[in-house]
Regions:
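ATP-dependent carboxylate/acyl-activation modules
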Residues: 1-214, 218-332, 342-346, 353, ...
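Glycine-rich, proline-tolerant flexible connector loops at the mouths of alpha/beta enzymes
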Residues: 335-339
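Conserved catalytic network of the ASCE P-loop NTPase/AAA+ motor domain
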Residues: 355-357
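Short internal beta-strands
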Residues: 359-367
């Protein structure tokens, strides 16, 4: 689960991390009031208007059809109002959103922490994430923080460093000092960065996050270390321990069909292909998607019905797949280990009866627990479907119906 920048900063602040202060607004008028309030509390004379969407690259991104950046400096209250008006309610297109962009429903009005006229500020990149290949939390950091970090990672990966954390002992003090030293800091700057790294890791570890990215981390001319941005991803498996954080979810930032699927316990990810697939188990789902691709099709989705699939869940899975107008065929590939094939078969029959006419050809492969009973249910239903025993046979049928 992802959250917005302003929400991530609020979490950081509770763990003692210095942040760029800001107030969220969802209208130009609220934005102006937020700017006035920030001027009172922080003394800032300039402000930064920051689009709040679940995507990076906002600083370089533009509002569709305009030259308005997703993050812009406002030097007056009139600027705050104008920029907010240009951004709110419109589609922001960045490298991470694709051509359609994402609608901006909120802006963060933040204090300007770069101090006009100062030349001794420095931006860094710091993130904490789970390196699944190593089975360890890892701190990634670089002296090349800012809007061009993606370019740095691609062109000069040697400028990004990693510090692995031993899960037995956690982050050690010497590791924090090592990171600060490698970032070229000394004196008060080194002390402040050491403290910053320790607090950031504590926040990450305490909330069961899978990633906490700060880009940029700013060192001011008076050696303050400030989180200017934040990007947080939670481990969904740990959210039951943090109901307050689960409430931060913004479903307007997610695909509506994926949200609906989640409500029925379905693991669904929409793709751009023409063959819908319904599978139980993530590994089998990925293999099925490969088979579809090798057969000349393109998977329209990833859909895992899980190990407790029943007729109602299978019917809902069909409804979700068929909402995609690009789907020209559906491949059902179920291995009955925990899930019973007869339940899946009954779900397919019920879906046909309850949904009326289905004009998309369906290829069904059911193997494992109660597969014989499942075949009987399908055969006696009179449904016009293609049945397969081997996976290659299913792939050949996909190729046939697409041609």
């Amino acid at each position: 689960m992802n959250i917005h920048e302003y929400q991530g900063k609020a979490i950081l602040k509770t763990f003692g991390v210095a942040i760029q202060e800001g107030i969220v607004a969802d209208s130009p008028e609220q934005a102006v009031e937020a700017a006035k309030e920030l001027q009172k509390t922080t003394g800032t004379g300039w402000w930064v208007v920051k689009s709040q969407i679940h995507a990076g690259g906002r600083g370089k991104g533009k509002i569709a059809g305009t030259e308005q950046r997703g993050v812009a400096l406002a030097k007056s209250l009139d600027d705050v109002k104008t920029i907010s008006k240009n951004i709110l309610g419109n589609q922001l297109v960045t490298l991470q959103t694709g051509e359609k962009g994402k609608k901006v429903n909120k802006v963060l009005i933040a204090q300007d922490v770069y101090y006009p006229g100062e030349s001794e500020t420095k931006e860094y990149y710091v993130s904490v994430l789970l390196d699944r290949s190593k089975g360890r939390n890892t701190i990634m950091y670089s002296t090349e923080g800012g809007m061009d970090i993606e370019t740095v990672a691609h062109d000069t990966p040697h400028l990004i460093f990693k510090e692995e954390i031993d899960p037995k002992v956690g982050l050690r003090d010497f590791q924090c000092r090592k990171i600060a030293f490698n970032l070229g800091l000394s004196g008060d700057g080194l002390k402040q960065m050491t403290k910053f790294i320790a607090s950031l890791y504590k926040a990450y570890d305490s909330i069961d996050a899978s990633m906490f990215e700060i880009n940029p981390v700013l060192k001011t001319s008076d050696n303050k270390i400030i989180a200017v941005d934040s990007k947080v991803t939670f481990d969904g498996n740990g959210l039951f321990r943090h109901p307050d954080f689960a409430a931060l979810r913004d479903t307007s930032e997610e695909d509506p069909t994926e949200v609906e699927a989640g409500e029925f316990g379905l693991n669904y990810v929409k793709l751009d292909g023409n063959v819908g697939c319904m599978v139980n188990g993530a590994g089998l789902a990925m293999a099925t998607m490969d088979i579809i691709k090798l057969s000349g099709g393109d998977p329209a989705n990833f859909l895992d019905v899980g190990g407790t699939a029943n007729a109602a869940r299978v019917e809902q899975a069909f409804r979700i797949i068929l909402k995609d107008p690009k789907v020209k065929a559906i491949l059902v590939n179920i291995f009955g280990g925990i899930v019973r094939c007869d339940r899946v078969a009954q779900g397919i029959v019920d879906a046909y009866k309850n949904m009326g006419t289905i004009n998309v050809p369906i290829i069904i492969r059911l193997q494992g627990t109660n597969a014989v009973e499942a075949k009987k249910i399908i055969d006696e239903s009179g449904l016009k479907v293609y049945s397969a025993i081997a996976l290659q046979e299913a792939a050949d049928l996909v190729k046939k119906v697409l041609s």
